[in-house]
A protein has these predicted regions:
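Glycine-rich phosphate-binding loop of ATP-dependent small-molecule kinases
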Residues: 1-199
Length: 199
């Protein structure tokens, strides 16, 4: 891929219910970049009857645990390759979620992508939980929007994903937004960050 333009990637991280998907939707509507949700790709693959990974993904989602990085990276890679977006700029939400994810990404994707940094949706556990439960009650159709799985997901976020955010922070590559605000306010903060990274 040395002659072709590399994909540019901004990871979007935060706890479950921090507003990652909502913020990505605002950004894609304004700028035309591509939003790839690792969770959505896994949920789609889970329902694909031809997928060799469906059963395995289903088990991880129900238990609130992290799917093997090879699976997630292959789904992200496929989605980026299939995209006809002229910008070649991707918001990847909900990934990387642990050190294994970073190692796997570096092994498989580092030749194809330039990582611009992490857009960190900073939100309290209480607000995150309330949003997810409201989303579940409103019929999100997500099997992981219930209190029991949410507790596990939040625990996984604290133990596995927060250290990843700290890892990028040491490189000066974390851009924080206060995602406890209304979505349009969060978006205003994000626009300044996008200008800063040259997007």
């Amino acid at each position: 891929m040395s002659t072709a333009k590399k994909f540019e990637v901004l990871f979007v991280l935060g706890g479950p219910g921090a507003g990652k998907g909502t913020l990505c939707r605002y950004i894609t509507e304004k700028y035309g970049y591509v939003h790839l949700s690792a969770g959505d790709l896994l949920r789609e693959e889970q329902t694909n009857l031809d997928s060799q990974y469906g059963e395995l993904i289903n088990r991880h989602i129900k238990e609130g645990t992290i799917v093997r990085v090879e699976i997630t990276c292959s789904l992200l890679d496929r989605a980026m390759q299939m995209s006809d977006n002229p910008h070649k700029r991707f918001l990847i939400d909900g990934f990387p979620r642990n050190q294994d994810n970073i190692d796997g990404w570096n092994k498989v994707m580092s030749e194809k992508c330039i990582v611009k940094g992490v857009l960190f949706c900073d939100c309290s556990k209480e607000v995150c939980t309330e949003r997810c439960l409201n989303r579940g009650a409103a019929g999100s159709g997500r099997t992981d929007d219930n209190e029991e799985v949410l507790a596990k997901r939040h625990e996984t976020y604290i133990t596995s994903t927060l250290p990843i955010i700290e890892h990028f922070e040491k490189q000066g590559a974390v851009y924080k937004v206060n995602s406890m605000q209304a979505p349009d306010k969060v978006f205003e903060e994000a626009k300044e960050i996008l200008t800063e990274i040259g997007w």
